[in-house]
């Protein structure tokens, strides 16, 4: 049976994804952000026709694809098997550990983490990592694999040629421009470094697709063994890289980061119940909350994830400031974090001299609360639906991905109330002719 891939309207597919929460949260959030900040090069695809609901009892697949995202995530894929058939062994919670925070989930290789593996006792103390799988029957798994391959084939046939043509024209324009000496090269940086020379993750091969937060069960369908391994991919599939071990995906109920009734909380003071240690505050001296544009260079200098300033300015974030008697006009935050374009808690960073003081948990809750608020980019106000249940559920879950060996960050997620329901990977996959 031939599998068809259909183009969908972003707003109209949201109710279907809301019904699959929390497992569908990454794709749902990415689509919501794309509605708030649209890109002409983005496409919403699914294995069922627009205007219809998926056939009951049959697996289906949906995705958001934007090849022009380049070195940032180009594709987010969700399969209904994630909600229906995810199987994951029990995960032992980690013991209390010092906050050593620079949580950034979108690494494409676990060795690219900000922490030096050889000096990290968390890594050396863990010998076995958890991997989530699908417990579905062989025929169902075979159908899901066929859907995944059909999606990749559709993207390669209908979208990749336009992207490659764009890259070729850009390279030609760059070559011509290079023949004319620039007035100044002070702002020019390598493709593999941030403006402050922090090594960045490598860009994917133009012929391949950078897929983010891919369920390890889906990745395993591309292996002949059906296991989470690189040893023997199925024909016509080349895996350029993937995370081994995978990331633990933590899910947070709204009651954990934004309870419905909190004493002393009001619309004017949405973070009043989130107690920071004495001497710290969620706003600068002028009362401004969040990460300001003048802080983005500092944020970029602390992470290897290539997030452009334009992207950072379009995602909800919060910052923590230190009380000081100084009147320095360039007051800078000492901790910050965001909800990424896919709604994940990302770039959660506490400066070294302020770690271990209990900042990460209230900061994380404040970030989630801001993004998932009714008027937030991922809240009910962003959904064009008359269905009250859809509007109620859309902001009910937040999530993040944390490396299994990063005990300090895992402990913070556990303190917030997060539960690991799946494991995921960032992978670069090429469909061969």
From Swiss-Prot:
Concerning InterPro entries, the annotation shows: Acyl-CoA_N-acyltransferase, Acyl_CoA_acyltransferase
Superkingdom of this protein's organism: Eukaryota
GO terms in the biological process aspect are:
terpenoid biosynthetic process
Provide the coiled-coil residue spans: none
Enzyme Commission code(s) on record: 2.3.1.-
UniProt KW Transferase keyword: yes
Could you list this entry's UniProt keywords, alphabetically sorted.
Answer: Transferase
Gene3D superfamilies reported in the protein's UniProt record: 3.40.630.30
| Described purpose of this protein according to its UniProt entry | Acyl-CoA N-acyltransferase; part of the gene cluster that mediates the biosynthesis of the neurotoxin verrucosidin, a methylated alpha-pyrone polyketide that inhibits oxidative phosphorylation in mitochondria and thereby causes neurological diseases. The carbon backbone of verrucosidin is synthesized by the HR-PKS verA, and further modified by the other verrucodidin cluster enzymes.
Q: What is this protein called?
A: Acyl-CoA N-acyltransferase verG
């Amino acid at each position: 049976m031939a599998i068809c891939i259909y183009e969908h309207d972003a707003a109209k597919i949201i109710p279907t994804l809301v019904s699959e929460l929390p497992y569908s949260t990454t794709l749902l959030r990415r689509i919501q952000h794309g509605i708030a900040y649209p890109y002409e090069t983005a496409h919403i695809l699914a294995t069922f026709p627009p205007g219809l609901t998926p056939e009951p009892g049959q697996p289906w697949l949906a995705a958001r694809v934007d090849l022009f995202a380049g070195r940032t995530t180009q594709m987010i894929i969700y399969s209904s098997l994630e909600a229906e058939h995810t199987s994951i062994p029990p995960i032992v919670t980690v013991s209390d550990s010092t906050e050593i925070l620079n949580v950034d989930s979108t690494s494409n290789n676990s060795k690219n983490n900000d922490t030096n593996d050889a000096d990290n006792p968390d890594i050396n103390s863990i010998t076995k990592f958890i991997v989530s799988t699908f417990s579905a029957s062989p025929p169902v798994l075979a159908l899901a694999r066929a859907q995944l391959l059909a999606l990749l084939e559709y993207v390669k046939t209908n979208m990749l040629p336009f992207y490659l043509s764009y890259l070729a024209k850009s390279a030609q324009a760059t070559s011509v421009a290079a023949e004319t000496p620039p007035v100044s090269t002070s702002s020019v940086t390598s493709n593999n470094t941030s403006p402050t020379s922090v090594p960045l993750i490598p860009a994917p091969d133009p012929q391949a697709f950078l897929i983010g937060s891919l369920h390890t069960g889906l990745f395993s369908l591309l292996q002949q063994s059906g296991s989470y391994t690189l040893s023997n991919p199925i024909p016509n599939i080349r895996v350029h890289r993937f995370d081994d071990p995978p990331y633990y995906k933590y899910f947070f109920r709204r009651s954990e980061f934004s309870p419905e009734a909190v004493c002393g909380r009001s619309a004017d003071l949405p973070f009043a119940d989130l107690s920071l240690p004495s001497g710290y505050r969620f706003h600068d001296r002028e009362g401004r909350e969040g990460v300001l544009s003048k802080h983005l260079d500092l944020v970029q200098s602390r992470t290897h994830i290539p997030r452009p300033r334009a992207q950072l300015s379009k995602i909800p974030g919060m910052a923590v400031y230190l009380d000081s008697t100084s009147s320095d006009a360039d007051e800078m935050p000492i901790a910050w974090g965001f909800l990424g374009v896919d709604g994940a808690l990302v770039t959660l960073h506490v400066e070294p001299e302020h770690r271990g003081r209990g900042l990460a948990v209230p900061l994380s809750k404040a970030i989630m609360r801001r993004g998932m608020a009714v008027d937030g980019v991922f809240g009910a106000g962003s959904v064009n639906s008359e269905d009250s249940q859809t509007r109620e559920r859309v902001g009910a879950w937040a999530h993040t991905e944390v490396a299994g060996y990063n005990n300090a960050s895992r402990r913070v997620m556990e303190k917030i109330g997060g539960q690991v329901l799946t494991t995921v990977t960032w992978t670069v996959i090429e469909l061969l002719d």
